[in-house]
Amino acid sequence: MTDIGTLNFTWSQAIIGGFVAAGITDAVISPGSRSTPLALAMLRQAGLRCHIAIDERSAAFFGLGLAKSSHCPVLLLATSGTAPANWLPAVIEASQSGIPLILISADRPPELQDCGANQTVSQPGLFGSHTRASYTLGTPEPGFNPGYLHRVARQACEQASWPHPGPVHINQPFREPMLPSEPVLSGEMPEKISISHPDLQPDLNALGDLARRISGRPGIIVCGEMPSRDGQNEALVALATRLRSPIFAEPLSGLRFGPHDRSHLCVRYNDWLGKTDLVSQYRPEWVIRFGAYPVTRNLQKLVSEITETHALVDPWPRWIDPARRLTHLLRSEPAAICKALLDLSLVPFSETWLSALAKFEGNAEADEQRNHIHVLLEEVPDDTDLFVGNSLAIRQMDTHSGSADKTLRIYANRGASGIDGNISTAAGIAASRGRAVALIGDLTCQHDLGGLALAQGQNIVIIVVNNGGGGIFDHLPQRDLPEFTQGWRTPQNVNFEHAAMAFGLGYAATHSDDDLRPALRHAFAAGGPHLIELRQC
């Protein structure tokens, strides 16, 4: 008769083998005792790259970064108790932003539930509506069918990947002992399961109606964060060219940087939209939005004021319409919609529309005051992955980054827009891509100091803009309150030198944009993890 420890391990071998057969290449393991069978199966699984992360909250955001940059599901493993609960912020972000994660929580067996057993909490359904699916498997039983577990793994991968990528939770109880009593051979290879997805073709009737509404009329294209696809940028530019329409391109759209035609882009809108009533002055009659809703309030306001024809292109089954203005929702890939519209009779609008917006863009560029965003984008190497923190950092990137031929892939956690886990996410991107740069604020850094442990050994440069607390509130109405300093600005007296030293990161303190440039050059040339603090207070 197979002993329980060996049974636990062979069961774990089967399910982890199923995940690897489904194409998963990365696992993030937070050490614990109850999860030992699964951890051992992961560590002994050829083809699975295992990352060890002590803190489960950081581990989950690290996995998020891996999955965000690779576009493939990533395994997370934690022991029982509060350990998996620490995943929740990253799970919410993954759900909101469409990032595939497989969450495997080890658990106590049924007989230890609801009786005061140590390190035992109710784990089934722990993440509520934030998962695409949630399973609690039975305890391993003698004579189990490995094919069942292979298919559970394949099903979980599919649900995490399509039609709307996101987290899937598997809760796995084990009885003691946790270790096999004898050597165990590798399990049988999972049977290949062939899966095909439908090609989301544009609805020609809906497109015909949209084409009639936009042809020969002034309008705008707005591109927010969206998954990158081959030919997508070129298709968007081709549609804008045909319509003589500007593209309001956010940093996360993938349109601001790269060798493609950028002549139709508006990228300094956050400056001039605050000074110009574009809707009343030029009366745009339509907007076509691609991807997530805009980050900045000026662009949000513009989008919300265009009500006659308001279209959203999004292949994922979600509803992105905070302004409640939609007239058309097109479930297809952006490139497919653009190409289908180009096959219809579209009349371009007058050149004066583009010329007026180009003048606004030119004036904003001429008036631009140089700052750390310009220095960073000038110095960052070509073909780099750049993670931008939430709060003030992403808004400054939106306002000041401009556009360039340099190939940059820009990321941010804009699903739920939290400032937690940002360093860990950037470290995950670095682990996946081989190099990353992160731009974050001082409060964001404080929120994820443990993420510096995951930066160890990574080729990552972290720039911390230390403005002494909640600098974003300087730009919000709360600044006029008498309690502003105490309740919102929350001045901090923190420098990050010793934090960097504690985790073995190179460190440089800079006090101006002129100081920042040589510090960046040194860090990029040296490689390895560096933290550069730009002190603005």
Swiss-Prot record:
<keyword id="KW-0479">Metal-binding</keyword>
<keyword id="KW-0786">Thiamine pyrophosphate</keyword>
<comment type="similarity">
    <text>Belongs to the TPP enzyme family. MenD subfamily.</text>
</comment>
<keyword id="KW-0464">Manganese</keyword>
<dbReference type="InterPro" id="IPR011766">
    <property type="entry name" value="TPP_enzyme_TPP-bd"/>
</dbReference>
<dbReference type="GO" id="GO:0009234">
    <property type="term" value="P:menaquinone biosynthetic process"/>
</dbReference>
<dbReference type="InterPro" id="IPR004433">
    <property type="entry name" value="MenaQ_synth_MenD"/>
</dbReference>
<dbReference type="Pfam" id="PF02776">
    <property type="entry name" value="TPP_enzyme_N"/>
</dbReference>
<comment type="pathway">
    <text>Quinol/quinone metabolism; menaquinone biosynthesis.</text>
</comment>
<dbReference type="GO" id="GO:0000287">
    <property type="term" value="F:magnesium ion binding"/>
</dbReference>
<dbReference type="InterPro" id="IPR029061">
    <property type="entry name" value="THDP-binding"/>
</dbReference>
<dbReference type="InterPro" id="IPR029035">
    <property type="entry name" value="DHS-like_NAD/FAD-binding_dom"/>
</dbReference>
<keyword id="KW-0460">Magnesium</keyword>
<comment type="subunit">
    <text>Homodimer.</text>
</comment>
<dbReference type="GO" id="GO:0030976">
    <property type="term" value="F:thiamine pyrophosphate binding"/>
</dbReference>
<dbReference type="GO" id="GO:0070204">
    <property type="term" value="F:2-succinyl-5-enolpyruvyl-6-hydroxy-3-cyclohexene-1-carboxylic-acid synthase activity"/>
</dbReference>
<dbReference type="GO" id="GO:0030145">
    <property type="term" value="F:manganese ion binding"/>
</dbReference>
<keyword id="KW-0474">Menaquinone biosynthesis</keyword>
<dbReference type="Pfam" id="PF02775">
    <property type="entry name" value="TPP_enzyme_C"/>
</dbReference>
<comment type="pathway">
    <text>Quinol/quinone metabolism; 1,4-dihydroxy-2-naphthoate biosynthesis; 1,4-dihydroxy-2-naphthoate from chorismate: step 2/7.</text>
</comment>
<comment type="function">
    <text>Catalyzes the thiamine diphosphate-dependent decarboxylation of 2-oxoglutarate and the subsequent addition of the resulting succinic semialdehyde-thiamine pyrophosphate anion to isochorismate to yield 2-succinyl-5-enolpyruvyl-6-hydroxy-3-cyclohexene-1-carboxylate (SEPHCHC).</text>
</comment>
<keyword id="KW-0808">Transferase</keyword>
<dbReference type="InterPro" id="IPR012001">
    <property type="entry name" value="Thiamin_PyroP_enz_TPP-bd_dom"/>
</dbReference>
<protein>
    <recommendedName>
        <fullName>2-succinyl-5-enolpyruvyl-6-hydroxy-3-cyclohexene-1-carboxylate synthase</fullName>
        <ecNumber>2.2.1.9</ecNumber>
    </recommendedName>
</protein>
